A protein has these predicted regions:
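N-terminal cationic leader/targeting segments used for protein routing and processing
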Residues: 4-7
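Catalytic cores of nucleotide-sugar-dependent glycosyltransferases that transfer UDP/GDP/TDP-activated
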Residues: 9-500
Length: 500
């Protein structure tokens, strides 16, 4: 240990000596509402392969499947102070695929109908953030890094500085640093300022424009951005975009201020869970047997109630049905698209107006449109493997996983150039044969339609199309590279020269 600029720093020379406490509000397969759960279920596995001692902590929701609850071991219990009130929390643990998971149990806060959207979410996740810190000496784990994710864990960094680093357990917390990952800047956890002393127990010296204050409210995500050692997002382009007014969701100012400590690390996908050679799809295939992909298409057309024709381009959409996903562009163009020689299959749920749009189209264009207003993991894999193209016209997309899954199964993405979509989809060049998809730059329905038309034109040339499908399947978006980047980031936070 040395002292650098009056700051004590532990040197961790190898990944194998690094210890990380990964705090998250959801993780697959225990609880999932979006891509955050996929990251939390996959990234720790990849980091442990590098020898990093990473452990995950999350709430013990009542919705966790019973098969996992039955395998959990009870460690013990203790209490958290929420100003004047003491709240019980139990500690359960379970090792899943080589990763230790710890679950914070409290019936008052986590036995609810759903994970989020409760009237007392601010209090619930204040409790969780305090538990993330309080539980460490109880389980005997002293990490170098606490890796926080999204607003639900945003208070950890400021609470660590305000109450724990120098004041608790005889220096136990003194050399712990925090990293904050923004998975989606739109969701920030904004609550009344009265929570400062009534629930959180923070002094008002933290309530200022460079701290937790946000238009006279408290902003949990901003707290994480302001007080963490490093801030990351899930793609390089998104890291640049959120420093602008258009994408910054009113936090662009503090993000520009923290720009030296802000970086983008692209998400990966679990190649074991998403493998076209597994029996989860109709007919397993690989980059060496692309012709078998056509068999998946025909069987998908039959299951989805579409006209069976292997020559008709089939476009898939798997998405939360919300405005962020560019569905208003599809709303403007869906009739024109379906009047073309193509088919469309949609899987997802969300806002009623978008569900109604797709259901209307299914009735108006029978045999050409299949609307499945739900989430179904098995059907999702069949769509990824059976479609020719995959449409993602997002208004903004921090990383996006759909296009990565699609390319894994040889389905060519059609995307808007934003966030992770821009970083992962290489525009197709008809002259060189390079590229992995079709893109458009502006948020415009006619540009989206033009990208679809360009894709359909190339689709008619079977040799060119096989080339672009091969390009897609040869891409590597596994977690290996991302895990090494995170490992290097952890070392940077601890003051270590980054390995190449």
């Amino acid at each position: 240990m040395i002292n650098r600029n009056n700051r004590s720093v532990y040197f961790v020379w190898r990944f194998s000596e690094m210890k990380v406490w990964f705090a998250v509000s959801e993780a697959a397969p225990f609880a999932k509402t979006g891509g955050l759960a996929d990251v939390a279920g996959s990234l720790p596995k990849a980091l442990r392969k590098h020898g990093i001692d990473i452990r995950v902590v999350m709430p013990k929701y009542s919705q966790i499947p019973q098969q996992y609850i039955n395998k959990m071991s009870f460690i013990g219990y203790t209490y958290v102070n929420l100003t004047w009130r003491r709240e019980y929390y139990g500690i359960f643990t379970l090792e899943h695929e080589g990763v230790p998971f710890y679950f914070i149990d409290n019936e008052r806060y986590f036995n609810r109908d759903w994970y989020y959207g409760q009237v007392d979410d601010g209090e619930r996740f204040t409790f969780f953030c305090k538990s993330v810190l309080e539980v460490l000496p109880v389980i005997g784990f002293r990490p170098y890094i606490i890796h926080c994710n999204d607003w639900q864990t945003g208070l950890v960094s400021v609470l660590l500085d305000a109450h724990y680093r120098y004041y608790r357990n005889k220096g136990f917390y003194q050399y712990i640093h925090t990293v904050m990952t923004i998975h989606n800047l739109k969701y920030q956890g904004i609550f009344p300022k009265e929570m400062m002393d009534e629930i959180i127990g923070l002094g008002w010296e933290y309530f200022h424009p460079d701290g937790v204050e946000f238009y006279n409210c408290i902003n949990f995500l901003k707290a994480g951005i302001a007080y963490s050692a490093k801030v990351t997002t899930v793609s390089r382009t998104y890291a640049e975009e959120i420093k602008t007014g258009f994408y910054g969701e009113n936090l662009d100012g503090i993000l520009r201020k923290r720009s030296r400590d802000l970086c983008g690390i692209l998400n990966g996908i679990d190649y074991g869970e998403n493998d076209p050679l597994t029996p989860n799809i109709y007919v397993p295939f690989s980059v060496n047997s692309i012709e078998d992909k056509q068999k998946n298409k025909v069987l998908l057309q039959k299951e989805a109630g579409l006209d069976v024709n292997p020559e008709t381009p089939l476009i898939g959409i798997i998405s939360r049905l919300v405005a962020q996903k560019g569905l208003d562009l599809i709303d403007r163009m869906i009739a024109e698209l379906l009047e073309m020689d193509l088919q469309l299959i949609v899987l997802g749920a969300g806002e009623k107006r978008y569900e109604d749009m797709f259901l209307w189209a299914q009735g108006a264009f029978r045999g050409k449109m299949s609307a499945n207003m739900r989430y179904d993991h098995v059907l999702a894999q069949r769509i990824y493997s059976g479609c020719d193209m995959f449409l993602m016209p997002s208004l903004f997309e921090p990383c996006g996983l759909g296009q990565l899954y699609a390319m894994r199964y040889g389905t060519v993405p059609i995307v808007r150039e934003t966030g992770g979509l821009k970083d992962t989809v290489i525009p197709y060049n008809e002259y060189t044969g390079e590229g992995t998809g079709f893109t458009f730059a502006n948020y415009n329905a006619h540009e989206m339609k033009d990208a679809v038309i360009r894709a359909m034109r190339v689709y008619k040339d079977k040799e060119k199309w096989r080339g672009i499908v091969t390009n897609c399947m040869q891409q590597d978006f596994s977690w290996e590279r991302s895990a090494r980047e995170y490992g290097n980031l952890y070392n940077q936070v601890c003051g270590i020269t980054v390995t190449k």
